[in-house]
Design a protein with these regions (language model features):
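Class I S-adenosyl-L-methionine-dependent methyltransferase catalytic core
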Residues: 1-255
């Protein structure tokens, strides 16, 4: 008998199959946390429930303040989160509150993922840097830039787009090697505009990961319009520009 893909009911399966997810917002507590680009625990929980099972082992190589690991804890999963920032690792450890089988490593994912002692994983859920966009002032709502770190190994500090993609490919090749067969790597990304240049990060990254061996299985559109309450008419009145209020979840499958 074939193994079930997840523990969802038929009703939950149908609801989660809709290509646009709108019911995922940060809590008031999450909004107060000092991180420039975090995502809600609710998103991670929904992804784990949809693409794995309650006994899974979860990997996040860009762990930040630990939303993925908190979701793993809440669903009685085990997990490993890795992040360069000592400050954010401390916050992540506070959030998981000593949960058994959940580990947070303050270090370089390129190095940690090469260590065979970390074992294998059933699923990866993560959100890599959106290139160096955090270092730029946002034109849509006027928010100032927030530097994630000054680490030379921080991919968010790379200025060349093609090199940035190449480095992401290298990192996710290490992730690929740590995933069990028939598992998913779910990647939260957003497309980028720098003045007149548009960079379709979601598709560029997906095709890089296909070169590794991942199957680009599908994608989810995460509607975040309710999170944006101070938008400006971009380009008005000379050149019409799109205010992006959505992000993507790339569904990459390791056969």
């Amino acid at each position: 008998m074939a193994k079930k893909a997840n523990d969802l009911t038929g009703k939950e399966w149908l609801q989660n199959s809709f290509s646009i997810w709108r019911d995922l917002k940060k809590t008031a507590e999450e909004k107060k946390m000092n991180h420039p680009a975090s995502y809600p625990v609710a998103l991670c929980e929904k992804l784990i429930k949809t693409f794995s099972r309650s006994d899974c082992r979860v990997l996040d190589p860009f762990n930040g303040i630990g939303s993925t690991m908190v979701a793993a804890k809440n669903l009685n999963c085990s997990g490993l989160g890795i992040d360069l920032s000592t400050e954010f690792c401390e916050i992540a450890n506070e959030r998981i509150d000593g949960a058994p089988n959940i580990s947070v490593i303050n270090g370089d994912s390129f190095k940690v993922l090469k260590d065979s002692n970390i074992g294998e994983f059933d699923i990866c859920i993560t959100s890599p840097p959106y290139w160096d966009i955090l270092n730029m002032k946002r034109s849509a709502d006027g928010k100032v830039s927030v530097n994630y770190s000054d680490e030379g190994s921080d991919l968010g500090n790379l200025s060349d787009y093609e090199y940035f993609l190449t480095q992401l490919k290298e990192l996710f090749s290490l992730v690929y090697n740590r995933l069990k067969p028939d598992s998913y790597c779910l990647i939260n990304v957003m497309d980028i505009r720098k003045k007149s240049e548009f960079y379709p990060l979601h598709s560029d990254l997906a095709y890089k990961l296909r070169e590794i061996g991942f199957v680009f299985d599908d994608l989810i559109i995460w509607d975040r319009q309710s999170d944006y309450n101070n938008m400006r008419p971009l380009g008005y009145p000379y050149r019409f520009r799109i205010n992006k209020v959505h992000e993507y979840i790339l569904i990459m499958h390791k056969k």
